[in-house]
């Protein structure tokens, strides 16, 4: 038993690899002992095999060498078991048994049972290192492609376009690293349509510009990859990965997935993995970038150019607002802007929108007002009104304006021009009822003669015919380019005049046919006794101030004998004193001969020297007349063919031979053309 242990310990001892060696059974060449187990570990250098041969074998014979035996073991597997006797097979060779193994390690185990009836001497064996052809001597081929043997080893090599993996045995294709950036392309497995290489991992990358989504197209007949095994596992496979999406792995004869794969990404990774076997042709696919769409509407109330059913990445459109709408950015408005479909599927300038044009707060008008509008945007309507009853609108339909597409308030008749409130002429707020003469007549109110203008020095009168114009007699303003004038007061008291409107003169325009004379007292020719005074500022109309109408040129405005007209003024009375309260009266028109027959009161003039023309009207009756201080005031007649009382200036107080009798009035109808032309040529106030 101790002997068994001793030999076992010796057998487990390992030494450095050697090129050759000798193995002898215990006690050789004497009889080997019973109950012995001994092991020899043989190791030659890497890259060599072992040639083992026996020159002597003499052991107990038994069935299957069950009693005594020599075992040859490689990698735990019994290669051979020997027992019995052997003799040389060749007379020239001492070898009785020999073996050659392609491995560089072997175990030889000697075993004897508990008794031997005969004397057996055991065995003698020798081993040596021999070169191995690894490329042919093994069942498993060591190289995937080309195997190259040399003494003590071998090396593997690969065909062109292949490379040797780190295991130095298998070849693969260098098919990774390709990056595709074109919007349209085709990708195929290596060697397609020839069989693809084994033991390879091909990685392809598609990297498109942001704003495109990758779409793959694969025909079934363009896909041939080693089918899955019985458990459904793909040893060769094609896989697609796009951000958070994965498609595959796919394998088989004919593409098993959808023929069109639409990703939501502009990047895609393709992985084609193969194992060591297979003779399939591989695959081919096509891809293209599908541009990301943008919503069709950026801003309502707009027109797009060009018009398309679908807008996609990089499309540029011109967006034009429809009439009445505009794009407002800051304080600047425009009717159009450009927008580009961006890579994120959103339009540039999406913050801009077509908003209704805002016409803004309507401008105020003189002597009128505009109602507060509910809104001031496109389509809104406003109404202007004049300050009634003292003003009226020049155009009957001129009060309604709508907010137009161009951002202006527009009237159907006037366009963008603002309405004008024209003073109502010839309508007193209180009709004159007392029929008393001025010369010694009764007082009246300014409301009955709102057109009456008071000239302070020399005292005289005038007629307001427009907010900028006063009509008077030429001799009232002769030699006075800046007369002091008031309107709106009945009394000439200082405190009352303070509350009246003082009129500031812009210019005095005397009729060009009026003959200038230095001394009024000696004047006998009052032909063309008419003048206009233009005012610097407009007169504000009201219950005490209003213009009188001008006559028209039709025959209806020809004064006729017997017509009753109104006169007013602050001239002297029969006791030859000037009054401070306005007086008025009704006077009939009479024939010019009646005025010619009046005895002259002026001691400096003869009756026959006075000039009478068709430019004059004679009016009055005994005791009813105008007098000094009334000059220039209006002789008012009712406007013909109107329902409500309205007056026009038929004449201007001009002169008379004697107060309290018949007086001469300048016939205004003869000067209407000159009046209108002069007013037009000097329209508006003079600006400082």
From Swiss-Prot:
Disulfide bonds join 65-83, 135-147, 143-156, 158-171, 175-202, 234-251, 294-341, 321-354, 359-403, 386-421, 425-549, 595-618, 627-659. It comes from the Eukaryota. GO terms for biological process: complement activation, classical pathway; glial cell differentiation; innate immune response; proteolysis; response to cAMP. Residues 1-15 form the signal peptide. The active site is at 475 (charge relay system), 529 (charge relay system), 631 (charge relay system). Its EC number is 3.4.21.42. It is an enzyme of class 3 (hydrolase). Keywords: Calcium, Complement pathway, Disulfide bond, EGF-like domain, Glycoprotein, Hydrolase, Hydroxylation, Immunity, Innate immunity, Metal-binding, Protease, Repeat, Secreted, Serine protease, Signal, Sushi. Residues 16-130, 175-290 form the CUB domain. Residues 131-172 form the EGF-like domain. Cleaved and activated by C1R to generate Complement C1s subcomponent heavy and light chains. The iron and 2-oxoglutarate dependent 3-hydroxylation of aspartate and asparagine is (R) stereospecific within EGF domains. Ca(2+) 3 binds at residues 226, 236, 275, 278-279. Residues 438-680 form the Peptidase S1 domain. Its main location: secreted. Gene3D superfamilies: Complement Module, domain 1, Laminin, Spermadhesin, CUB domain, Trypsin-like serine proteases. The modification (3R)-3-hydroxyasparagine is found at residue 149. It is found in: Secreted; Cell surface. Residues 292-356, 357-423 form the Sushi domain. Glycans are attached at residues 174, 406. Core component of the complement C1 complex, a calcium-dependent complex composed of 1 molecule of the C1Q subcomplex, 2 molecules of C1R and 2 molecules of C1S. The C1Q subcomplex is composed 18 subunits: 3 chains of C1QA, C1QB, and C1QC trimerize to form 6 collagen-like triple helices connected to six globular ligand-recognition modules. Component of the complement C1 complex, a multiprotein complex that initiates the classical pathway of the complement system, a cascade of proteins that leads to phagocytosis and breakdown of pathogens and signaling that strengthens the adaptive immune system. C1S is activated following association of the C1 complex with immunoglobulins (IgG or IgM) complexed with antigens to form antigen-antibody complexes on the surface of pathogens. C1S is cleaved and activated by C1R to generate C1s subcomponent heavy and light chains. This is Complement C1s subcomponent. It comes from Rattus norvegicus (Rat).
